[in-house]
Amino acid sequence: MTKNKIGVFGANGRMGSALLEAASTKEHSELAAAYVRSSSPLLGINVNQLNSAADKTVTFSDEANITNVDVLIDFTLPAGMRTHLQTAVKQGVPMVIGTTGLNEADMTLLHEAANHIPIVFARNYSVGVNVLLNLVQTAATKFGDDMDIEIFEAHHRHKIDAPSGTALAIGEAIADAKGWDHDKVAVYDRSKVEQAKSQNEIGYSVLRGGDIVGEHTAYFATMGERLELTHKASSRMTFALGAIRAAGWLINKPAGLYDMQDVLDLK
């Protein structure tokens, strides 16, 4: 059986470590490369020393040297992703991207790169969250115009971007279902809104603390009842396994920009 050769950027990070394990243990994939910065003290060290599931022949290697991989996975910060994306295009290697906190210029780069290679970009790779995106759209279309919508998210103290990419994806899914322009209806700071809540708005609340992997709740509140749709992740392996699934799906796909909804056939 031919296995998909996976290369992981940011292999020494929290998500990178989970991706190394997932790539090493899934039946149809194998960890072919674990990339770190050229200044990393891990450079040249056998990955198996830190992750017993990894093949003993794989060492941490310089992210500038991409060889012998079928697909690349990147969950690093935006600055790193930009460099890695250029490398992937130059080498003609498909790429799975889970980086959050991207700006408009970054999204333009993604779209341009997708003219040359197949890319899966998703803010969350868990199956549950992607099912949630469908559920919130259904809920948004079933309630009347007097519905109030709020999104709450919680993550570990180290997460930089806020609201999370997943929270924004939930809000955008709801706005799309309602026919709203998300940028015009999103409210991120109510302390400066000196008036009652408008019905045509989506509010965001954020918590950062401890080691929370990720929690998201969409509230649909109207007079006399409230619907709460919640997803809680207890392990980063949830996202890592989803990314490995996306990587296997992406191989041999034509150039283009895909998302996890495509991978799971939820569209």
UniProtKB/Swiss-Prot annotation:
Regions crossing the membrane: none
Predominant localisation class: cytoplasm
GO annotation, biological process: diaminopimelate biosynthetic process; lysine biosynthetic process via diaminopimelate
Annotated catalytic residues: 155, 159
Binding-site positions, (S)-2,3,4,5-tetrahydrodipicolinate: 156, 165-166
Top-level class of the enzyme under EC nomenclature: oxidoreductase
Recorded metabolic or biological pathway in which this protein acts: Amino-acid biosynthesis; L-lysine biosynthesis via DAP pathway; (S)-tetrahydrodipicolinate from L-aspartate: step 4/4
Keyword Repressor: no
Role according to the record: Catalyzes the conversion of 4-hydroxy-tetrahydrodipicolinate (HTPA) to tetrahydrodipicolinate.
UniProt-recorded name of the protein: 4-hydroxy-tetrahydrodipicolinate reductase
Origin species: Pseudoalteromonas translucida (strain TAC 125)
